[in-house]
C-alpha cells in the first residue's frame, strides 16, 4: 500500500522517501493492533518518533480491509489539521482540513475530516451524527489535550463513543493537573 512508502517520522525527521520501512516500535505496535483489532488503542511515543506515520498506516490498513469507511482526525490546532491532511494525502487518504461545523455533510470526495478539539466541543452532536453514519476510525492526536477543558473531554466522549475504532496518540501520557486524559 501507499503507506509503506511513508517515512517513519513524517513530516519532521527523515526526508520524504528515505525511510524504507517502519521503525521497530511502529511495526510492533501495528502488529499488535492488527492482531487484536481493539476499539480503543493508545500509542505513546516521544515527539518526532513517528506517531503520525503509525496512525496513517493503521488508517490505510483499516480502510483497505473495509473495517472502516471514514476517518476523523482530532488535533489541538488549526495548523495541525492541515499537516494531517497533507500527510494523509501522501498515502491516498483524502481528509478535509477546512471542514466547518456549519457544513454538516462531508463532500463525497473525502475519506474523512480533520477537526480541532474545540471544534468538536462546539457541536459534539454533529460529530456524533457523522460518526454514526459510517464505520469510522477516530484518530485523537495529542490526546492529553482532551482534558484541557472539561467540555473537550465530555465532547470527545459524546461525539466518538459510537466510533468503530479510536486511536489515541500522545507523547505526554500524563497531565500536571487532576483532569483525566
Which residues are covered by each model-predicted region?
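Short regulatory helix/loop adjacent to the ATP-binding pocket of P-loop NTPases
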Residues: 175-181
Amino acid at each position: 500500500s501507499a503507506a509503506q512508502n511513508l517515512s517513519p517520522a513524517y513530516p519532521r525527521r527523515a526526508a520524504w522517501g528515505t525511510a524504507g520501512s517502519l521503525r521497530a516500535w511502529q511495526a510492533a505496535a501495528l502488529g499488535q493492533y492488527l492482531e487484536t483489532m481493539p476499539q480503543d488503542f493508545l500509542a505513546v511515543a516521544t515527539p518526532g518518533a513517528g506517531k503520525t506515520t503509525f496512525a496513517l498506516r493503521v488508517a490505510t490498513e483499516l480502510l483497505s480491509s473495509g473495517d472502516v469507511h471514514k476517518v476523523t482526525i482530532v488535533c489541538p490546532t488549526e495548523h495541525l489539521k492541515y499537516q494531517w491532511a497533507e500527510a494523509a494525502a501522501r498515502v491516498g487518504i483524502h481528509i478535509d482540513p477546512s471542514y466547518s461545523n456549519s457544513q454538516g455533510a462531508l463532500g463525497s470526495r473525502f475519506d474523512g475530516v480533520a477537526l480541532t478539539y474545540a471544534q468538536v466541543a462546539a457541536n459534539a452532536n454533529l460529530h456524533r451524527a457523522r460518526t454514526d453514519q459510517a464505520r469510522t476510525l477516530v484518530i485523537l492526536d495529542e490526546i492529553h489535550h482532551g482534558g484541557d477543558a472539561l467540555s473537550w473531554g465530555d465532547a470527545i466522549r459524546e461525539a466518538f463513543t459510537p466510533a468503530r475504532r479510536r486511536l489515541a496518540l500522545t507523547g505526554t501520557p500524563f497531565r500536571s493537573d487532576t483532569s483525566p486524559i
